[in-house]
């Protein structure tokens, strides 16, 4: 579905990614793990065209995306949930969710997808009239993911969904990712909580200093000695 081949990218004179290649197949949950500053967020920003790659090829299904502007990426079925969520704090939960269905094809299925989001996040149904800015951190993350799902994406990009959340809330967020995987959603998730994300992912890539250092089945990486020592505290 998604294929990156030899992607390099950066900001100004700083290069953040070096010759990165990865794939996400339909129905997979794929994790990108690594330390702070490894280039994980930059990778998602390249995919959603918030920044341009300086080298390499980016493709979604049969479409080359290198020259596609950022506002058009949603038309190719890619939805991005950024690390800071970027909700509209003075709008209600349901109004925020409605913002995710702004493209014509999504507007036509608003009611159906709203019910799907409420089924996935029952708390959002309870809070639907509440201002998004008054939600807890975990509830805001659920709302942000729900808003992205309202577009009916083929691929969901999640940037550090557990960042800044209490452990019990982190578990709830990963339970949602697990449910999305079971329901056939395709997810590319960037995450520093390696122990949790390798439990829900099918495959994973280790990104360090802007380069892919390891890749494989998530279950295999959980048993990798270097991963255990550096990221799992074992």
Positions of the model-derived regions?
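Conserved ABC ATPase signature
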Residues: 131-135, 139
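ABC ATPase C-loop
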Residues: 148-149
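Helix-to-loop junction immediately C-terminal to a conserved catalytic motif
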Residues: 48
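Conserved ABC transporter NBD signature motif
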Residues: 56-64, 76, 109-114, 216
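Catalytic Walker B motif of ABC-type/P-loop ATPase nucleotide-binding domains
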Residues: 156-160
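ABC-type ATPase nucleotide-binding domains, specifically the catalytic core motifs of the NBD
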Residues: 12, 68, 93-112, 120-125, ...
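The feature captures the beta-strand-to-loop junction immediately N-terminal to the Walker
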Residues: 33-35
């Amino acid at each position: 579905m998604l294929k990156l081949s030899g992607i390099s990218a950066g900001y100004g004179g700083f290069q953040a990614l070096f010759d990165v290649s990865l794939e996400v197949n339909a129905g997979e949950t794929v994790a990108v793990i690594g330390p702070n500053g490894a280039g994980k967020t930059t990778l998602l920003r390249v995919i959603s065209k918030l920044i341009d790659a300086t080298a390499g090829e980016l493709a979604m299904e049969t479409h080359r995306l290198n020259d596609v502007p950022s506002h058009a990426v949603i038309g190719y079925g890619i939805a991005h949930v950024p690390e800071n969520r970027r909700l509209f704090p003075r709008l209600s939960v349901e109004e925020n969710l409605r913002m995710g269905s702004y493209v014509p094809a999504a507007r036509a299925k608003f009611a159906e997808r709203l019910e799907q989001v409420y089924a996935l996040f029952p708390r959002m149904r309870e809070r639907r009239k509440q201002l998004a800015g008054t939600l807890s951190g975990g509830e805001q993350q659920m709302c942000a993911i729900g808003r992205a799902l309202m577009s009916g994406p083929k691929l969901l990009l999640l940037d550090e969904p557990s960042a800044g959340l209490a452990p019990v809330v982190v578990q709830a967020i990963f339970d949602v990712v697990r449910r999305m995987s079971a329901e056939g959603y395709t997810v590319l998730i960037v995450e520093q909580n390696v122990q949790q994300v390798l439990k829900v992912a099918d495959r994973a890539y280790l990104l360090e200093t802007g380069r892919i250092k390891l890749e494989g089945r998530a279950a295999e990486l959980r048993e990798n000695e270097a991963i255990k020592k550096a990221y799992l505290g074992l």
